[in-house]
Amino acid sequence: MRRAPALVVLMAAPVIATAQVAPNRATAYLHPTDVRDARALWVNPAGLGVLREASVYAEVAVGDPGARGRLRQINAGFNARGLAFGYQRDIFDAGIRGHTYRLGLAGASAGLAAGFATAYYRGEGTKATGWDVGVSYEWRQGLALGTVITNIGQPVVRGLRQRLTFIPGATWHPSAIPTVGVSAHARITPDSVAAYAFGVSWQGGQRGGGSRWPVAIIARLDTDGGLRRGAFALGLSIGNRDRIGAVASTPGDVSTIDGVSLYGVSTREPVKRR
């Protein structure tokens, strides 16, 4: 059996067949400071409280797309003004199935948001619980800072201990071109800097603009602690409040596409009363 590189298992592994623990697919292409819909439950729970919105999403991930492609992950969830729930089903080799149930709560005030999420791991004799806590802050106009502490309690899931990880990050939208976002974050374990991630995004047809079907593009590069390329993700989405998108993942050398996911997100912000 071929062993997957540790970096890929950590960051993009929902499509990796040999892993017995699969991160949520959204963690392979989003950053802790650039997600504010229901997917924040898996990336940074503080993002659930930033907009006080209601949102639902669903995503399907396939590994090794093509003639030998296999369904690897199905996940879905909702956020109701900071109260969120999500479910993730993983399909591994040898008929192994994993189930993760996640509950989150977040709130925000004056640009500062904080939240927590608890994960319940089940399936194949597994019964474990882990916690994440996160904060985000709109430090200046166009600059968001945030951090997440994941795997508090270091749960053991199907024989693998989930390491306590500190994830600081930032997203910057230049005032001259606010439709462009530049993001970066690091994954730090108690004994080392495990990985870095760098991304750029572009959003066309902002709310209130003239485009009915705005297009957004995201790109993200993941490296190990020595800045050696480990994974690359490229995504395209169409829509605004109701959005559909696709994300493709490759190894660091971009030699092949090893995973593709399709998702849909629907968001509604509260109507201001007169």
Name every feature range the model reports, one short phrase each.
Residues 1-24, 253-274:
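Cleavable N-terminal export/targeting peptides
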Residues 17-82, 258-260:
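N-terminal, post-signal peptide beta-strand-biased segments of exported outer-membrane/organellar beta-barrel
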Residues 21-24, 84-186, 250:
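Outer-membrane pore/translocation modules
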Residues 37, 67-70, 95-97, 125-127, ...:
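Short sequence motifs at beta-strands and strand-loop junctions characteristic
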Residues 43, 54-56, 72-76, 81, ...:
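Hydrophobic, lipid-facing positions within transmembrane beta-strands of outer-membrane proteins
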Residues 52, 78-84, 108-113, 140, ...:
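Short, solvent-exposed coil/turn segments at beta-strand boundaries
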Residues 61, 79, 88, 106, ...:
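A structural detector for beta-sheet-dominated domains
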Residues 146, 156-160, 164-274:
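Outer membrane beta-barrel transmembrane domains
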